[in-house]
Amino acid sequence: MERIERDPETIYMLYTGGTTGMPKGVMYKQGEFLTFLFRTLKAMGYDVPEDLSDLEASILASKTNDEFIKSLVGCPLMHGTGMWLGAFLPLLLGGTVITTSNLGFDPDKLWAQVQDKKATNIVIVGDAFAKPMLDSLDRAKNSNNPYDIGSVKVIISSGVMWSAEVKQGLLSHHNMSLMDTMGSTEGGIGSSVTTRENPSETAKFAINPGVIILADDGEILKPGSDKIGLIGTSGLVPTGYYKDEKKSAETFKEINGTRYSFPGDYAKLESDGTITLLGRGSNCINSAGEKIYPEEVEEAIKTHNDVFDCLVVGMPDEKFGQRIVAVVSTVDNKVLDELVLIENTRKKIAGYKLPKQILFTDEVKRAPNGKANYKWAKSYAEEFQS
């Protein structure tokens, strides 16, 4: 088949997951997008062919050196994590992409496929996938029928918090690299790599070149600042949102002659140059004048061994404006005392960030891509308000 030459100015578009509103079409110039993908592969340590003529030799070398990629995509391909990290990157290296045939996420079937297909890479979306995967490994091991996951070299995640405790649990089953990437459809921000030898902290990332933290007053923050700010990246900036000039102007801005993408996440820039992710500004809860980010509270609550999943929302309050309410599911639907859970959470975060109410449910609802369904959580919480 004759090769089709594409204009690098051609628009490539992927829709956002619609976590904080209606899905938006994010537009990239195809040439810039491909350059970004190849840079990402190099940053991940892969040998990237210089041109098409080198591709066949590169694939043969990867098979000879046991470096051929077999990527199992655990999350939906409609999501940037699944499409870009799970499919595009391995395909650019001539690798194999493994998909699941069943609807919904089944961790037992995922590990069975890993065992059967000898997958080297697994792509997921944070704890929403990783925690059930860990539970599946634990059950299999306890029943003396563990999965053979020796082929796995790396698990890659993006889009949802991936807690340090769950990472360590996965590493107890197999020594591999756990790559936690931070970004969105609007641009990449940073990453964190965890191994048995090098543990990591939850929500802490080394930032990519061209990333800034912009305070609400317009100051570009320096490492060690006590302020928080919006994360902006100049690494790969979309041309805009499809047919949405207003939102494009709000998200993609020029600062000091450089164009940045501001997807809406807030962070603190630590003294060592890393960032601690706080969460999406549109989900921020304002309680008694304090800004509280749901993701930070959720991760603190989930440190309790009996908590399986959690979402935190702000509910109307006459005294504080909003009060923090947590919707929690427990491991095997165990009965958990609300006050005990609040006191355990107090060990991790400041008192004003603690939930004023905890509501228990059999299942915390999430989108198929693992993203938080705050609309459902708020609706659930409303049922219990007097």
Segments from the language model and where they lie:
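Conserved pre-ATP/AMP-binding loop-to-beta segment of ANL
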Residues: 1-15, 21-22, 52, 60-71
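Conserved S/T- and glycine-rich ATP-binding loop of Class I adenylate-forming
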Residues: 10, 16-19, 71, 77, ...
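Conserved AMP-binding A3 loop
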Residues: 11-51
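Gly/Ser/Thr-rich phosphate-binding loop
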Residues: 18, 92-95, 119-124, 134-200, ...
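Conserved AMP-binding/adenylation subdomain of ANL enzymes
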Residues: 34-74, 78-123, 136, 140-143
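AMP-binding/adenylate-forming catalytic core of the ANL superfamily
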Residues: 115, 234, 239-240, 250, ...
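Conserved beta-loop-beta connector loops within the AMP-binding
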Residues: 212-233, 271-272, 334-338, 372-373
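AMP-binding/adenylate-forming catalytic domain of the ANL superfamily
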Residues: 347-371
